[in-house]
Amino acid sequence: MSLIHPLIDVKEFVENNSCKSRFITPISGDQGSSTTAFCSVSMPHDLPHRHLHTSCDEISILIRGEGVYGLGDQRISARVGDCRVVPKGAEHFFVNESGEPSLMVGFFVGAEDVAATGIAYGDLVTKDDLATLRSEQDGGILINLGDVQPENMDQGDGWLITDFRLPISTRNGCSSTLFRARFMPGAVHKKHRHENCDEIYYIISGRGLAGAGSDRVEVRGGHFHFIHKGVEHWLHNLSDTEPIEVVGLYCGAGSVADTGYVYMGDVTPDDLKARTG
């Protein structure tokens, strides 16, 4: 049986042994989303083009690798766990200076594909760019997950997530919310819906069962899942030993309250037995 709510697997793309940097947009207008999710793998020391987006902000998280961000004339050190907002119109780039391929997941907010971002390319980044003195970021948003405190969510509203953090939201001036969730074995985010916004999430690692409407599907590291606003959904960790790590975006909602969160009830034993895709 096919799934109603898009689940896109990028595991092979992420783990490909190719020696080339690569970029993919697994969620876009093709799946009915008004926000585009991207996945970017950069090889060590590859020099990209500077670029900007005239029509949208870019939100991203660096999941693997380290190096340097460019933002206008600034050069900022980049490390795992960095969550970043690049304002529309700001020229930017990332160079991976680690010894392994980096992984960045991000979102072009309110743009249904790359063309709709108003992308414009500049010159190639040079070695002189990388030699520029590193500084603190001035403009946009940059915060590391390690500097963000876990939220104290109400378990009575279905939040049985072990560690839930909101690195980007209206608290630091963003009209969308970037979240990172860790589900230890047995943890669950019970049935709920968002009346006011779509949700896109990416499974960094782990294995679980996801519900979306009538869909019941096993998810694992490398899956993107798109949830339309108003659709009941949930996530349960199926592993006895490993956590699930998830990062996602509440598109166009600057807080959990702004999503129009509605608790819908328990995930039942029958739910956990079912598979529809």
Predicted regions and their residues:
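A short, N-terminal "cap"/entry segment at the start of jelly-roll beta-barrel domains
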Residues: 1-34, 116-176, 260-277
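Short acidic-glycine-tyrosine-enriched beta hairpin
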Residues: 73-88, 214-230
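A short hydrophobic beta-strand segment most commonly corresponding to one strand
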Residues: 85, 100-118, 226, 241-259
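Asparagine-centered strand-capping/turn motif at beta-strand->loop junctions
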Residues: 95-97, 236-239
